[in-house]
Amino acid sequence: MPESLIAGIPVHFPFEPYPVQRAYMEKVIQCLRDGTNGVLESPTGTGKTLSLLCSSLAWIRTRQSEHQQQMVKIEKADFSGLAGGATGGELSDLGKTMGRANNWGVPKVIYASRTHSQLTQAMRELKRTAYANMRSVVLGSRDQLCIHPEVMREQGNSNKTNMCKLRVHSKTCTFQMRVESRKDHPDLRGPSIMDIEDLVKVGQRLKICPYFASRELVPQADITFMPYNYLLDPKARKANKIELGNTIVILDEAHNIEKICEESASVQIKSSDVAMAIEDVTHIMQVFASGESQDMAGDEPKDFTLDDLTLLKEMLLELEKAIDAVVVDNAAEGTTFPASLMYELLGKANFTYGNVATIVSLLDKLVQYLLVASQQMSIRKGGTFTMLSDLLTIVFANKQDVMSKVYASFKVHVQMEESKQGHGKQQGAKQQGGWLGKGTIAAASGTSKVAKIINFWCFNPGFGMEQLLNTQVRSVILTSGTLAPLKPLIAELAIPVAQHLENPHIVDQSQVYVKIIGTGPDRQQLISNYANRDNPKYISSLGQTILNVSRIVPDGLLVFFPSYPMLNKCVDAWQASGLWADISCKKPIFLEPRSKDQFTSTMEEFYQAIRDSKGAVFMAVCRGKVSEGLDFADRNGRAVIITGLPFPPLKDPKVILKRRYLEANRTRENQLLSGQEWYNLDATRAVNQAIGRVIRHRNDYGAILLCDSRFKDASQVQQLSKWIRGHLGDRPQCSPFGPIVRELRQFFKNAEANMKLPDERETDAPLETVCKTEDEPLAAIPKLKREPGSNATFKSANESAIKVEMANSIKTWTPADYASAAGRKLGGAAPSAMDFMSRLDSNVSSIDFNCCTDSKSGSSDLVKIHKRERSSPTLPESSSQVSKKRYKLVENIKVEPSSSQAKAAPEERADFLRALRSLVTQDQFRRFGKALLEYKNGTYESFQDLMAILLDVLSAPKVRYMLVGMRKYLKNEHKDEFDRRVGSL
């Protein structure tokens, strides 16, 4: 690989670095050399991660070489000769050399990011470099690395963690017990870089625990990859035994670092948590009193006594009493108190700095006990004890000598908690009675107290960073594509910064088209503020804007909304008006789901649609998974539409208190933002992140359309990324919609003519395996989930895929027979007429709705069907056809979908499914699929169920042609009734 001398350090880079990459690496090396901190911004797509890894590891390698030379010099020294006749200068030089060798040491690198998918991307970048042979390891959770079938059956990370601890403590986990004897195995210590998936595979092969094996690799690793919380959460740092002395801490994707620092120091406890903890302690006491404890927990002696339980219960009862006594003036919104209230509440229950370590230890022992007991009887597994332990750990992490700072930076906000049924006064009165009663003090006293939620919120991110700096780290580097403005970030984190950088983008001006669209095609103002977001005219105009843009933008179009409620509101309105169907005719639409399982399958379908058809539209939400971590390079994202500014909820108590904190602590010297400036910046940073999904590398190109007139305001423009501001000019203005359409069409025409076509491997890779893994049968470990190994397509895409964290737990609505049907090879036995899902892997037919040429045969009303191979993307028949297309600008006219008489349902099953998916919501499509599969092998009742769903989903005039098209998939005995019911519509 080419070698470049940067800041005096030879750096091997996969290619000759661009000026922005060279500037970035120079800043990194300066930080490491001087032992200082840096805040570095470089836009997404500039090779930030690659530059970061190469520069830091090049410096580490240089230091290792220097260290070895110093050690050799010491070994060769003739001490006897020096002692007898050496000069004072020689002795002094040798002394300095020995001092450097002993105390200087070679620092380690800790690379942290927000999610494991981002860490996997970074490790994949490292594999491309000359530093791929340096020792590395990634730390993950038990949820991701554990291969013990019993532990993996537990629900929730907390239960898995506690069950793992229990098995390790009782020496019943054979995987963990083998780690010591096999930790030096070549497969584990080899030169290859192992991510989470690789560690799991090695663990399965060697039959050792990947979780504990990875911890064994840390001391010898040159670079360790881990998520943020392992660093910033003191409890996680202690649990994972992370030593930070003389380390270089790199926080990538650090645009959310303030929030992460605040959240790591915040905690919540509910009245119901305390009440359940009292019940759990009481239950254990009853077991002790009855003599059943030995049967429940085996022959091992207990780590606690009945006296310990009695004391803990008394403390919990006092805590419950103290919480009940808190007066909430505003029941609807809650009441805010000084931070001292939390210490007062805990103090009344005798939780103090002096005994908190003992109490936390007792709570952890009780969790272990309940985990064992829960194997034999139906009881809770100690989750409330874990919550209480977290509360005490976080609240008392702040030392007594900094309490004045704590009181200025924290607030307690008390909200009302909805009481659960069955926790009433009568029940408590019956159960109260002596120490073995389960009732609470409130119940015993005959009063009915309202349950509360106690929030202990931190508003000073400097607390988390200060704890990090106090561990004697060598350097801290914060980096992201969207950190600006840097001064207020540095001020809030209270971190001394010697190096800072705001890089321009690596792409040419001609590769990016940026415009502010202030009005839609009907001249309706586009502004997604509180006063206008419910305006039907605005929602319609926004839909018309997306429709017109979808006609021009090739391949993938991303549309980001400020929030999920706004996204759902627009979808409902567009489906009712017919705009949804019209957009779907141009490109199939995908919505960002909120659940992890659905998200993974939806992304797969989106990438497949990009390859198989004329593109697709993905509608998502700022701050969601799509906007934060996924790569939409090349065809996957040719344009991004931002529909509004995603401001935090104005009335949210946490937002109100954050603004008050900034106003109260802002001075001329500390340069903190005002409350309003922070509020605006929080929205703009989310926009910057969403925009960064599109331009992903040097040869990429795309359009950025800001569809909210507020983007022209100077306060908003100044908070956009520097490279975007360069495209908007000194005085940004809203552009008329008509000229934008012409310019946008010309932009893509020029880009397609002048830019190099993307490599098909890069384009098709992103989520083919990413988000999907399958269950593979393992003889030793049933139900263990791994990446698929049989599908050649998945194998070829694996190297460049973006791994979505915990993708191995995906479950979709598709039954097992759907998967087997979809996997039928071409040329095999023909599927039956009822096997509706069977041809998704075969060559399919598609309807070219964009075709503007007349068919030479048949009626002009017919839709021309084009055959295509699934393995290649759909292309226009010729470039001349594309240039002859005419796009009609919709203005002041409500667009109605074509009548059902002019449409016919697709003939092929796969095309029918795709067309149906684009016309209905995800929930409707899932209901349809489930009913259809039940009908396939079902009875007359299943036909009635299917008909009910069909009539509910497809009875509207604009989609009735799809209802008619369903007839041929029905059994013969049901077709007459189908005709009667459809005919009566």
Swiss-Prot record:
The keyword Repeat does not apply. Keywords: 4Fe-4S, ATP-binding, DNA damage, DNA repair, DNA-binding, Helicase, Hydrolase, Iron, Iron-sulfur, Isomerase, Metal-binding, Nucleotide-binding, Nucleus, Phosphoprotein. [4Fe-4S] cluster binds at C146, C164, C173, C209. InterPro entries: ATP-dep_Helicase_C, DinG/Rad3-like, Helic_SF1/SF2_ATP-bd_DinG/Rad3, Helicase-like_DEXD_c2, HHD_RTEL1, P-loop_NTPase, RAD3-like_helicase_DEAD, Rad3/Chl1-like. GO terms for molecular function: 4 iron, 4 sulfur cluster binding; ATP binding; ATP hydrolysis activity; chromatin binding; DNA binding; DNA helicase activity; DNA polymerase binding; metal ion binding. GO terms for biological process: DNA recombination; DNA repair; DNA replication; male germ-line stem cell population maintenance; negative regulation of DNA recombination; negative regulation of t-circle formation; regulation of double-strand break repair via homologous recombination; telomeric loop disassembly. Its main location: nucleus. The keyword Protein biosynthesis does not apply. Residues 7-303 form the Helicase ATP-binding domain. A motif (DEAH box) lies at residues 252-255. Its EC number is 5.6.2.-. A probable ATP-dependent DNA helicase implicated in DNA repair and the maintenance of genomic stability. Acts as an anti-recombinase to counteract toxic recombination and limit crossover during meiosis. Regulates meiotic recombination and crossover homeostasis by physically dissociating strand invasion events and thereby promotes noncrossover repair by meiotic synthesis dependent strand annealing (SDSA) as well as disassembly of D loop recombination intermediates. Belongs to the helicase family. RAD3/XPD subfamily. This is Regulator of telomere elongation helicase 1 homolog. It comes from Drosophila erecta.
